[in-house]
C-alpha cells in the first residue's frame, strides 16, 4: 500500500496507507473500504507485508482501500477536544472528529478518484468502538455516503484478567503507554500458547507496537460498555461483526454473539459470528486472508444495498388497493411495511 497524508479543513493532517486498483475488475458499484485500527497500532496493522495486507484481497476484488493512522498516532493530528463538555469520552471525541471532518475529507479527496459509490468502515478493537460511534452519529448530511460497518476484536463482556492489567497500567501511567511486546503478543496473538499465527509475524510485532494514548484505554475498559448502546441503537446500515474464538481481551460465546447482534435493532442486516481458531488480532493471524475476503464480499453487498435503496423511493399504500395492507394498519399489528416504486415489499419487525 502507498503512504499518504492529506490536509484537513480544520487544520492538521490525516495520514495512512491506500491501495487503489488501476482498473476495476467489472463495471459495478464499488465500496471505498476505510480501515480503522485498534489501540497500539497505526495504518501498518492492515498492511504488514504482502501476505498480511488487506490490499492482497481488496486488489483482487477491485476494491479501493484506505487504512488510517488514527488521530493522535504518528503524523495524524490529534482530535480537537471540546473543553466545555466534561462528560465526553475519548472515543466520542475521535468518533465525532472522524464523522464530521476526516471521512468527509477522505471522500472529497478520493471518492471520485476511485470511482467508489460509498464508504464501508472496517474496524478493529478500539477502532471498532470509534467506528460504532461514527455510524451511530451519522446522519447523511456530513458530506460522505456511509453504506456499511465491519467490527472485530470487540464484544459485550471484557475478559476480567486483561481488564485488570490494563487498569493497573493506567494507574501508573504519566503519559502514553508503551506495551511490553512479550505479554502483548500473548494477549493479542496467543503466542506461544496457541498455534494461531505464522511464526514470522512475531518478527513484525515489535515495530508494529505504537504508544497508546491513555484516554482510549480508559474509555474501552471503564466506560464503553455503559454507553455503547446509545450509538448501536441508532445504526441504520448493515453490520458485520467477528469475535475470535481465542480473543484475549473479550469473552467469546454464543450468548455474547447474540447480545452483540441484538444491539443493532435499526440495522437492516446484522451478522455476528465466532472466528474459529483466531486470536484477538484476526488480521495478524492465520485467519487473516479468510477474514479480509469476507470483509470485501460484505462491503460489495453493502454498496449494492445502498444503491438499490437510494433508487427506490418509498410511497404510501392506499387502503383497499389490494396490496398486503396499509402502512398504518400493519404498524398497529407490529409490522412495518414499506412499498417501493418497484412494487417490492420490504417487511421488518416481524
How would you name each of these model-derived features?
Residues 125-151, 157:
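Conserved hydrolase catalytic core segment
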Residues 278-287:
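Catalytic histidine-centered segment of alpha/beta-hydrolase-like enzymes
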Residues 245-272, 278:
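Conserved loop-alpha-helix segment in the C-terminal half of the alpha/beta-hydrolase fold
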Residues 86-110:
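Alpha/beta-hydrolase active-site loop
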Residues 55-77:
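Conserved alpha/beta-hydrolase
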Residues 160-253:
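Alpha/beta-hydrolase
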Residues 1-24:
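N-terminal cap/lid segment of alpha/beta-hydrolase-fold proteins
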Residues 25-57:
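Short, surface-exposed "cap/lid" segments of acyl-processing enzymes
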Amino acid at each position: 500500500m502507498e503512504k499518504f497524508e492529506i490536509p484537513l479543513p480544520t487544520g492538521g493532517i490525516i495520514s495512512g496507507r491506500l491501495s487503489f486498483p488501476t482498473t476495476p475488475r467489472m463495471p459495478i458499484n464499488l465500496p471505498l473500504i476505510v480501515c480503522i485500527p485498534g489501540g497500539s497500532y497505526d495504518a501498518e496493522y492492515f498492511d504488514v507485508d504482502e501476505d498480511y495486507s488487506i490490499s492482497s484481497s481488496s486488489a483482487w476484488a477491485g476494491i479501493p482501500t484506505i487504512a488510517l493512522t488514527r488521530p493522535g498516532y504518528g503524523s495524524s493530528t490529534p482530535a480537537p477536544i471540546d473543553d466545555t463538555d466534561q462528560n465526553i469520552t475519548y472515543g466520542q471525541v475521535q468518533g465525532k472528529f472522524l464523522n464530521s471532518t476526516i471521512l468527509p475529507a477522505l471522500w472529497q479527496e478520493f471518492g471520485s478518484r476511485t470511482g467508489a459509490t460509498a464508504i464501508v468502515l472496517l474496524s478493529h478493537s478500539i477502532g471498532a468502538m470509534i467506528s460504532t460511534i461514527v455510524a451511530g452519529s451519522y446522519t447523511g448530511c456530513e458530506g460522505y455516503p456511509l453504506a456499511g460497518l465491519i467490527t472485530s476484536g470487540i464484544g459485550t463482556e471484557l475478559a476480567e484478567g486483561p481488564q485488570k492489567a490494563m487498569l493497573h497500567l493506567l494507574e501508573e501511567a504519566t503519559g502514553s503507554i508503551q506495551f511490553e511486546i512479550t505479554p502483548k503478543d500473548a494477549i493479542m496473538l496467543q503466542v506461544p500458547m496457541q498455534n494461531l499465527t505464522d511464526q514470522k509475524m512475531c518478527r513484525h510485532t515489535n515495530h508494529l507496537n505504537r504508544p497508546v494514548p491513555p484516554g482510549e484505554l480508559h474509555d474501552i475498559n471503564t466506560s464503553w460498555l455503559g454507553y455503547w448502546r446509545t450509538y448501536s441503537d441508532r445504526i441504520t446500515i448493515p453490520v458485520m461483526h467477528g469475535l475470535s474464538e481465542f480473543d484475549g481481551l473479550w469473552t467469546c460465546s454464543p450468548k455474547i454473539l447474540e447480545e452483540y447482534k441484538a444491539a443493532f435493532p435499526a440495522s437492516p442486516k446484522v451478522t455476528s459470528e465466532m472466528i474459529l481458531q483466531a486470536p484477538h488480532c484476526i488480521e495478524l493471524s492465520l485467519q487473516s486472508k479468510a477474514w479480509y475476503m469476507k470483509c470485501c464480499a460484505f462491503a460489495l453487498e453493502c454498496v449494492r444495498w445502498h444503491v438499490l435503496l437510494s433508487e427506490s423511493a418509498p410511497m404510501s399504500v392506499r387502503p383497499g388497493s389490494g396490496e398486503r395492507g396499509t402502512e398504518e394498519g400493519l404498524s398497529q399489528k407490529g409490522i412495518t411495511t414499506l412499498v417501493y416504486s418497484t412494487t417490492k415489499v420490504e417487511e421488518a419487525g416481524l
